[in-house]
């Protein structure tokens, strides 16, 4: 059984027991919560597709960790001008463990 849900403007395909990295959510570590925007649920041959969401479907998850991703370097370079601009960015993420899928 797996489900596709939407969080942080992205769609994620998950099954029970899976750990997923999402865009930062303001939820404390160890806390349980639910995603209501489930787009599709598949259980063997039974496929439920929402228009746009599946009515009554939920993905239950627990926050495992909060953190920051790897550094991404941004470089702007102008040739022959002795000019260079360098910048870095680390995106915040929330790691969640999927504990249940209800359809």
UniProtKB/Swiss-Prot annotation:
Q: What Gene Ontology terms for biological process does this UniProt record contain?
A: translation
Q: Which family does it belong to?
A: Belongs to the bacterial ribosomal protein bL21 family.
Q: What is this protein called?
A: Large ribosomal subunit protein bL21
Source organism of the structure: Actinobacillus pleuropneumoniae serotype 7 (strain AP76)
Q: Which InterPro entries match?
A: bL21-like (IPR028909), bL21-like_sf (IPR036164), Ribosomal_bL21 (IPR001787), Ribosomal_bL21_CS (IPR018258)
For this protein, the record's HAMAP family field holds:
Ribosomal_bL21
Q: How does it assemble?
A: Part of the 50S ribosomal subunit. Contacts protein L20.
Query: By which gene is this protein encoded?
Result: rplU
Q: Its biological function?
A: This protein binds to 23S rRNA in the presence of protein L20.
Which Gene Ontology molecular-function terms are recorded? rRNA binding; structural constituent of ribosome
Q: Name one Pfam family in it.
A: Ribosomal_L21p
Q: What is the lineage of its organism?
A: Bacteria, Pseudomonadati, Pseudomonadota, Gammaproteobacteria, Pasteurellales
